[in-house]
Design a protein with these regions (language model features):
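Periplasmic-binding protein-like
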Residues: 152-159, 239-275, 294-307
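Extracytoplasmic small-molecule ligand-binding "clamshell" domains
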Residues: 30-131
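Bilobed "Venus flytrap"/periplasmic-binding protein-like clamshell domains
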Residues: 89-104, 135-137, 156-211, 226, ...
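Ligand-binding clefts/hinges and TM-proximal coupling segments of bilobed small-molecule sensing domains
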Residues: 40-61, 187-206, 277-307
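Extended ligand-binding regions for polar small-molecule ligands
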Residues: 22, 34-52, 96, 104, ...
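A ligand-binding cleft/hinge motif common to bilobed small-molecule-binding domains
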Residues: 119, 135-142, 190-191, 221-253
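Bacterial lipoprotein signal-peptidase II cleavage site
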Residues: 6, 18-33
Length: 307
């Protein structure tokens, strides 16, 4: 998860936090399993041409707007943003679909560029007009940029469908848990196993993978008892594997994520906020998330909500 987490009570002691989700490599990697394994009817392709320009919202853009929205993204985070398509090199995901839909409402072209996650916010207003990369809304970020809320996400555990080992999300001591390297869950897994040891229970064996697809594959294949990931990632794993994976327990530490705009660009901020609200009101945003098998759509595009 790309945020500062609030840990569950089980893992509160000795926990470390990350300000964002990163991978070991700065290069984007495809998010779908190789050779089509585990594919399902999701994602449902989104056609941005079905979204029309709203003239009164487009008129809110700054007078010096050049006609193209440049969007900074970190294409390593399926199903939100990753490289996919027939060539495996096309920016894909619900955040990418959202960027295209915003462009349609605003009557603008959209250019999505990959960047290291930590480099996006410093480049807002210079290299990029917007950052749409699963940025959780935090006080630290609100001090630097404007953020428009659009989705809510948290952390989830996932197990093979039917929970064959009868696991309880409140006590995963003694299990083998898979996480993607560099995520918040990677750090939280250490805190979880430390809490088990403090309670005199068997530790969690944490297996780390550079690719989320590898985590999911090993869960389905039986090498893992449980997977720990962001809620959209877990939901996507469920549909990607044709229901071979299911959520265990509730979503934890859910928090809103926001579209990032430069603090001093009031006109662009207001235009993007209005465009986001339009997509919420007309059902397009819900349609995009439904197409990816993901929940968490917000109904109000709030500017700089309290974090």
């Amino acid at each position: 998860m790309r945020r500062l987490p609030v840990l569950t009570a089980l893992a509160a002691a000795g926990a470390l936090t990350l300000s964002g989700c990163t991978n070991a490599s700065s290069e984007p990697t495809a998010g779908a399993p190789a050779d089509g394994e585990g594919q399902s009817s999701v994602p449902v392709p989104f056609d941005p041409s079905t979204v029309g320009t709203v003239d009164e919202i487009a008129a809110m853009l700054p007078a010096d707007f050049d006609g193209t929205l440049t969007v900074g993204d970190n294409l390593q985070y399926a199903p939100a943003e990753f490289l996919g398509g027939a060539d495996g090199q096309t920016p894909t995901g619900y955040d990418v679909d959202l960027a295209k839909a915003l462009g349609q409402v605003l009557g603008a072209e959209v250019e999505v560029s990959h960047a290291e996650f930590a480099s996006i916010i410093p480049a807002i207003g210079t290299e990029y007009d917007l950052g749409i990369a699963s940025f959780s809304i935090t006080p630290e970020r609100l001090a630097e940029v404007n953020m428009i809320s659009y989705v809510r996400a948290g952390s989830t555990f996932s197990v093979p469908t039917g929970n064959p080992d009868g696991l309880d999300a409140a006590d995963l001591c003694g299990t083998t848990m898979g996480v993607q390297t560099g995520t918040v869950q990677d750090e939280e897994a250490d805190a979880l196993t430390a809490a088990c040891e403090q309670q005199g229970k068997d530790p969690i064996e944490v297996l780390r993978y550079t690719s989320q697809a590898d985590v999911t594959t090993n869960l389905v294949g039986g090498k893992l008892d449980v997977m720990y990931a962001d809620s959209p990632v877990g939901q996507y794993a469920d549909v990607q594997t044709d229901g071979k994976v299911e959520q265990l327990g509730d979503v934890q530490d859910a928090a809103p994520q926001g579209i990032v705009v430069a603090k001093d660009d009031v006109e662009l901020t207001e235009a993007v906020q209005a465009a986001m609200q339009q997509l919420m009101d007309d059902g397009t945003w819900q349609e995009i998330l439904d197409g990816w098998g993901v929940t968490g759509a917000l109904s109000t595009a709030e500017l700089n909500p309290a974090a």
